[in-house]
Amino acid sequence: PSNRAITFALEQFLQIDSLNIPFILIAGNHSTPRTNLSSPILKIFENFKNIYVSYNQEYKKIEFDDVIFHTLPHLNDDSKALMQIESCEANISESKKNIMMMHCSVGAWYLMQEFGEWVYPSNKEYIFEKMDYVALGHWHGFGAVGKHKNVYYSGSTERTSLNDKRNSKGFIVATLEDKLNIEYKSINIRPIRIKEINCDDLQDSIANLDISDTHDAIVEVKLTNLTAMGSIDIPNKQIKDLFPYAMNVSIKREFKKSDDNQTLSDMEAISLEEYF
């Protein structure tokens, strides 16, 4: 995230901390360094009185008067996962509520070999039955997990890419009394607007562009019917300047086929001399 985003977030965490509201954060794959040369970003919260963090790629128990949070952050090394899960199981208390917090994929065995993925082992899913609630992060959509009645992904509270534009965003309110009650709270977030500029008739297409609905929006601009030479003459800044009040503008270039049926993907595979 940008410095501006980090600064804004810290101001909100300071407000929560000042109100003496306990707040627990666990590290995900994007906030976990892949080498020992980097420092975990969540370390900045160590000196906050009411913010508890778990980021060292190991199990951490966070205990209160009537509840224990069993936290398992993202793990880069799957070989260490079993020991950490067993530590978690050993700390389950029968006299308190037990909430498990993890950043991983549950039930997605097909991702086992993907770089940067931590997949929770299926032979340890029986531990979920010993928990009052299992709160998961990593996947960006809300949903229950498989046959488990107490295991949920809350999803992200904001879209993290344009591929996420159709998904509802929100958060979970979990109530642990006699039985678990899960309520999903949908929130209104900034819209994603898709605009198209036909580069066969660039000036007229720009003149007819409707930007009235792009204030504070995430905008995706499709430049269609591009040629290789024509694309060079349309810098990204020129297009982004058309949307001065948008929160973010991304540009997708769609090249039309040339007479010899070569496309953009072909350009990446041959030399410029051969292409032209």
Residue ranges and their predicted role:
Residues 25-37, 60-62, 76-79, 105-110, ...:
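Active-site environment of divalent metal-dependent phosphoester hydrolases
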Residues 66-76, 98-105, 151-155:
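Active-site-proximal beta-strand elements of phosphoester/diester hydrolases
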Residues 18-23, 96, 130-132, 149:
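A short helix->loop->beta-strand "cap" motif at the edges of active sites that frequently abuts
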Residues 112-180:
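Conserved beta-sheet core of the metallophosphoesterase superfamily
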Residues 1-60, 127:
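Core catalytic region of metal-dependent phosphoesterases/phosphodiesterases
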Residues 6, 76-82, 92-131, 162:
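Active-site-proximal segments of metal-dependent phosphoesterases and phosphodiesterases across multiple
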Residues 177-276:
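Accessory, non-catalytic peripheral segments of nucleic-acid enzymes
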Residues 9, 28, 69, 103, ...:
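Divalent metal-coordination and catalytic microenvironments
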